């Protein structure tokens, strides 16, 4: 599905993930779905001629003396999925599609053990801090130290990085990062651990004070195990 970049604006990419090539029936015909949506005229879609999963594009925004600065965080799996293009070409395609010269691509290393290679379980945009810098919530504990360190360094160059603090880290604790946010509420996946589920909710309440009393948790462990949360 297209990924929402901001209110009323969606990015539409080529959805043809390598991990579904043996089960093509699960590859959504994005154009057909959009065509059947009666509300489609209310939104703007940007076509990007790149093979990218929506879960591998996390959008962030900051402020400086010249106005807004925009960021897209992706893992380097995008480079592998578009191997005929150079990194600079991929970056140019994305920047030109948005017509936003102040758009920065932040690349994270791709852990090959993660077949999805998505960033939406690694980093979550929280907002803009008092210094105008984007603030992000991250979960790096599931990665080997060298990969986690490289991810942290790449993110900290641009963002205020807040780490998800839990008493223990489950193989599914990345799901806490992959929450759903609307203008009215935030829904956080629960993974069936009463302690860490509560800790995740508490940290969201600290990071999103405007959403206090509107942050909810839905238990999804079995669903996430079966479907990766997608």
Regions found by a protein language model. Name each.
Residues 1-230:
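The feature marks the mature, well-folded catalytic cores of soluble enzymes
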């Amino acid at each position: 599905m297209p990924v929402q970049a901001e209110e009323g604006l969606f990015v539409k990419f080529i959805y043809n993930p390598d991990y579904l090539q043996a089960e093509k029936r699960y590859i959504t015909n994005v154009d057909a779905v959009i065509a059947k949506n009666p509300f489609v005229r209310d939104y703007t879609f940007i076509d990007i001629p790149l093979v990218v999963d929506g879960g591998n594009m996390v959008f962030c925004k900051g402020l400086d003396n010249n106005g807004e600065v925009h960021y897209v965080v992706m893992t380097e799996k995008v480079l592998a999925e578009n191997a005929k293009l150079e990194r600079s070409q991929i970056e140019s395609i994305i920047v030109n599609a948005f017509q936003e010269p102040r758009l920065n691509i932040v690349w994270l290393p791709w852990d090959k053990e993660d077949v999805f290679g998505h960033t939406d379980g690694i980093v979550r945009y929280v907002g803009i801090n008092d210094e105008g810098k984007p603030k992000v919530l991250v979960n790096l504990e599931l990665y080997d130290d060298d990969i986690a360190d490289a991810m942290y360094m790449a993110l900290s160059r641009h963002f205020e990085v807040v780490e998800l603090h839990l008493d223990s880290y489950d193989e599914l604790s990345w799901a806490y990062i992959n929450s759903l946010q609307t203008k009215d509420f935030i829904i956080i996946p629960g993974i069936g651990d009463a302690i860490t589920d509560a800790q995740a909710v508490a940290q969201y309440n600290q990071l999103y004070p405007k959403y206090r009393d509107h942050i909810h948790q839905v238990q999804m462990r079995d669903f996430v195990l079966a479907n990766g949360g997608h």
